[in-house]
């Protein structure tokens, strides 16, 4: 049996969004095999968040977070399927954590699919021009640009960002762990971030499912 290392547990967690202890337990049962570990989690219903993500979310909470002595604030709407789940400590903690994350990380969109075409094209042009200025071969431009766009999405899309309290997880993966634990679909509907002196603020501007 392969040794169950922290690195192996982390890899399974990144693949499935399951918790550390759940991943370790699955790997022990799977004798250290990553693929089999995924199967174990799916059988337990822990890695099945994707199936729940198509279900309607009509309940939920509005969460707020105020930071820096009232100089920075966030309001976020997170939805779930039932009022029962909305009242649980796990769901309320998730809403608070997402609001806090938005305050710290300042995302502009909820997910990659929300980024407008004009923003995408402008960013691609910038990365292509930068690659050319660095002397990169023209035939490699598309590949280089694609890699840099992935980093760009991580910077501006809430669900792609590393979670501020645990950087080994993205916010999207965090949501999936809660979907698996609570047994209901959960979606981030919208958010707005206010900062004193910033007249525009940050507004997600859409109601978009958090995990698919």
From Swiss-Prot:
Pfam family, one: EF_TS
Any one Gene Ontology molecular-function term assigned to this protein's record: translation elongation factor activity
Keyword annotations of the record: Cytoplasm, Elongation factor, Protein biosynthesis
Principal location: cytoplasm
Ranges for region Involved in Mg(2+) ion dislocation from EF-Tu: 82-85
A GO cellular component annotation in the UniProt record: cytoplasm
Gene3D superfamilies: 1.10.286.20, DNA helicase RuvA subunit, C-terminal domain, Elongation factor Ts, dimerisation domain
InterPro entries: EF-Ts_dimer_sf (IPR036402), Transl_elong_EFTs/EF1B (IPR001816), Transl_elong_EFTs/EF1B_dimer (IPR014039), Transl_elong_Ts_CS (IPR018101), UBA-like_sf (IPR009060)
Lineage: superkingdom: Bacteria
Subcellular location as annotated: Cytoplasm
PANTHER family, per database record: ELONGATION FACTOR TS, ELONGATION FACTOR TS, MITOCHONDRIAL
Entry function: Associates with the EF-Tu.GDP complex and induces the exchange of GDP to GTP. It remains bound to the aminoacyl-tRNA.EF-Tu.GTP complex up to the GTP hydrolysis stage on the ribosome.
The family this protein is said to belong to: Belongs to the EF-Ts family.
Entry-linked HAMAP family: EF_Ts
Protein name per its UniProtKB record: Elongation factor Ts
Organism: Solibacter usitatus (strain Ellin6076)
Gene that this polypeptide is encoded by: tsf
